[in-house]
Design a protein with these regions (language model features):
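N-terminal export signals
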Residues: 1-14
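Acidic, serine/threonine- and proline-rich intrinsically disordered appendage/tail regions
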Residues: 354-356, 363-368
Length: 396
C-alpha cells in the first residue's frame, strides 16, 4: 500500500473451518496484528476501493480504553486480501478537539463506503463527548460527522451532516449503519433520532445527495418507533432483488426487521423469528446484512445454551439465510460465523465481546466479518476477521 509501512498479519487460522452448505463453502477466522501489541482495536469496519492497480480493502478503526471510551479514528488498508496490512494512521479530522477545560469532543462508530460516482471514500460516524478519563454523562446533543478520502488518498476536514428537525434535538445519527447506493449516486441512509426529554429513539431512512465533498439530506421517510428502553437503534439497510430490508437493534430482548419497496416507506416492524415462528432472544446488539447475489443473510448474536452468562450474549456471532417472503431466519442454515473465545460458564467477563462488527464483500469469492474484540474485564482483545468463502461467485 503506497505511503505506508507494510505489516504481516496473523500466522495460522484461529478458527475451525466449517464445510459447505447453503452457498457457504467454509468459514475461517483469523487474528490480525496491527500496530502496537498493547493496542486493542474497536469498531473495525471495511470497504473495498477500486484502483488502477487493482482493488484494495480500506478499514477504519480506533483504540478502546474503557466503556464507550475510544481513541482517534484511524485507517489501514490491504491490497492482497488481508495477507498484509498498512500501518494504522490517524484520520486527522476525526480526532479529538477540546470543548472546554473538562470536555473533549471526538468521533466514533465510523463506517467507510466507496462512492463510485465521485471515486471517493465516505466515512460517516457521529460525535461523542469525553471527560479526561471516560465517557461524558449526560451527553450533549449528537449528530453525524463525516470525512471524505479523495481519489488521491487525502482525507478532508470533518463536516457535520445537518438536519434541522426538532425530532433530532437530542440526537440524530447513522452510527454503525449499513447504507445503500442509488443509481443516481444518491445514498439511502438509515437514521435513529430522538428529541430532548424522550428516552426512546425512532428510526427513518433518508435520501441523501453527495457531490464528493458534501452530504445533504433531501427527504426523510416516515418514522418507525418502539416504546421500550432507548427504542430502535443502529439500523442497517440492504437492497436485494429490487426490495429494501432494514434490521434494527432494540432493547426488549428482540431484534426487528422490516421491508420496503422504495427504501423510505417501511412496513410495520416485526421481531426476528425462526422460520417456524419462534422469536430469537437478542439483547440490545446490532445486526448486519451479509450480502451475496444468490441470497440475503444476517449476521447476529442471540441467546444460546453456551452464552447465557455472557454480557448481552455478544458471542458467538451467527449467520443465517433470510427467508425473504416470511422475513424470518432459516433455522437449518444457521452456523457460527465467529466462535466464542473464553470460558463462558466460569469466567463470562473474560469472554471476548463480538457485538460491534461489520461485513464487506472483499472479492467475488469471499466476504469478511470484521470485529474489534475485547473482554469486559480488561478491555483487551484481538482484531478478528472471519472469511466467508462462497461456493459460487458473488456477482455483487
Amino acid at each position: 500500500v503506497a505511503g505506508a509501512a507494510v505489516l504481516r498479519t496473523t500466522g495460522g487460522r484461529a478458527g475451525t473451518a466449517q464445510l459447505g452448505r447453503d452457498g457457504i463453502a467454509r468459514i475461517e477466522s483469523e487474528i490480525v496484528k496491527l500496530g502496537s501489541p498493547q493496542t486493542t482495536w474497536f469498531s473495525a469496519r471495511a470497504c473495498t476501493v477500486p484502483g488502477p492497480s487493482g482493488q484494495s480493502v480500506l478499514m477504519t478503526l480506533q483504540s478502546i480504553h474503557g466503556s464507550d471510551f475510544f481513541g482517534p479514528v484511524q485507517w489501514t488498508a490491504t491490497a492482497d486480501l488481508g495477507r498484509t496490512w498498512s500501518e494504522p494512521r490517524p484520520i486527522p479530522s476525526l480526532g479529538r478537539r477540546r470543548v472546554d477545560a473538562e470536555i473533549e469532543e471526538g468521533v466514533c462508530d465510523v463506517v467507510p463506503e466507496y462512492h463510485a460516482a465521485t471515486k471517493t471514500v465516505l466515512a460517516i460516524g457521529h460525535n461523542v463527548f469525553y471527560r479526561p478519563k471516560g465517557f461524558y454523562r449526560p451527553q450533549p446533543p449528537r449528530w453525524p460527522v463525516y470525512a471524505v478520502r479523495s481519489p488521491e488518498g487525502v482525507w478532508s476536514e470533518a463536516r457535520r451532516l445537518p438536519w434541522d428537525d426538532p425530532r433530532g434535538s437530542n440526537i440524530y445519527t447513522c452510527n454503525c449503519a449499513q447504507r445503500s447506493m442509488l443509481d443516481n449516486g444518491h445514498l439511502l441512509i438509515p437514521f435513529s433520532f430522538g428529541p430532548q426529554g424522550r428516552a426512546d429513539r425512532s428510526v427513518a431512512t433518508a435520501e441523501v445527495s453527495f457531490d464528493g465533498r458534501e452530504l445533504k439530506i433531501l427527504r426523510m421517510g416516515p418514522e418507525l418507533r418502539l416504546n421500550a428502553g432507548r427504542g430502535l437503534l443502529e439500523p442497517s439497510l440492504a437492497r436485494f432483488d429490487g426490495r429494501y430490508f432494514l434490521t434494527l437493534r432494540a432493547e426488549d430482548d428482540r431484534g426487528y426487521v422490516t421491508t420496503s419497496d422504495d427504501g423510505l416507506r417501511w412496513a410495520p416492524i416485526r421481531p426476528w423469528c425462526w422460520d417456524d415462528g419462534e422469536p430469537l432472544a437478542m439483547s440490545t446488539t446490532q445486526q448486519r446484512w451479509l450480502m451475496h447475489s444468490d441470497a440475503l443473510r444476517l449476521v447476529y448474536t442471540r441467546k444460546s445454551a453456551e452464552n447465557a452468562k455472557v454480557f448481552r450474549w455478544r458471542a458467538p456471532l451467527y449467520v443465517a439465510e433470510v427467508d425473504r417472503r416470511q422475513l424470518r431466519l432459516i433455522r437449518s442454515s444457521e452456523r457460527v460465523a465467529m466462535a466464542l473465545a473464553g470460558d463462558a460458564e466460569r469466567h463470562p467477563k473474560d469472554v471476548e465481546q463480538l457485538g460491534n462488527f461489520h461485513t464487506v464483500a472483499a472479492d467475488p469469492g469471499q466476504s469478511w466479518i470484521t470485529v474489534g474484540a475485547f473482554a469486559p474485564s480488561t478491555f483487551k482483545g484481538p482484531l478478528r476477521i472471519s472469511r466467508v468463502f462462497w461456493t459460487r461467485p458473488n456477482r455483487g
